[in-house]
A protein has these predicted regions:
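Soluble sensory domains of the PAS superfamily and closely related sensory modules
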Residues: 35, 45, 98-122
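Extracytoplasmic ligand-binding sensor domains of the Cache superfamily
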Residues: 60-109
Length: 153
């Protein structure tokens, strides 16, 4: 009986931790749905869409998910915190040029994946200065390269 209690308490703790994580972080399916909605909005009105993405409005702020877009040269044109940032300078801890890969894999009508590592600042409550693996779903729509990233772990 004692082992059952230990097992049950351990299972309960793991279950609570995993549910807490899933509430904070979006899934691949949720990211894909958001990217598809973002593409539709860009096709309808690009300027309006980029403003909505930057302001994180219109349902484009779900858990930790948000769409972002860059022009063909890699400059972010729609992003909640980094409009004007050059994606080509985004290099992860493994030395991978993430921005360059975004530009290379983006194709009209197709969603491709770019996986990379990212560390968040210590003052971010969810992350506590831990490195995470993320995957961005990337596509091209008109003259924009757009993506939504989700955590893998």
């Amino acid at each position: 009986m004692r082992y059952f209690k230990i097992f049950f308490i351990s299972w309960l703790l793991i279950s609570l931790i995993s549910k807490s994580f899933s509430k904070d972080f979006g899934t691949e399916e949720e990211a894909k749905n958001m990217l598809e909605r973002a593409v539709n909005l860009i096709n309808y009105d690009k300027i309006y869409a980029l403003n909505i993405f930057t302001e994180r409005k219109g349902g484009f702020n779900f858990k930790d998910l948000y769409p972002f877009c860059a022009d063909a040269s890699g400059i972010l044109t729609g992003h909640p915190f980094n409009v004007g940032f050059d994606l080509l300078t985004f290099i992860d801890s493994d030395g991978k040029n993430v921005g360059k890969e975004f530009l290379q894999v983006a194709q009209v009508g197709k969603i491709n994946k770019v996986t990379f590592k990212i560390t968040y600042p210590k003052d971010t409550i969810k992350t506590k200065d831990k490195e995470y693996e993320k995957t961005a779903l990337v596509t091209r729509v008109g003259d924009q390269i757009c993506a939504v990233g989700y955590h893998n772990n």
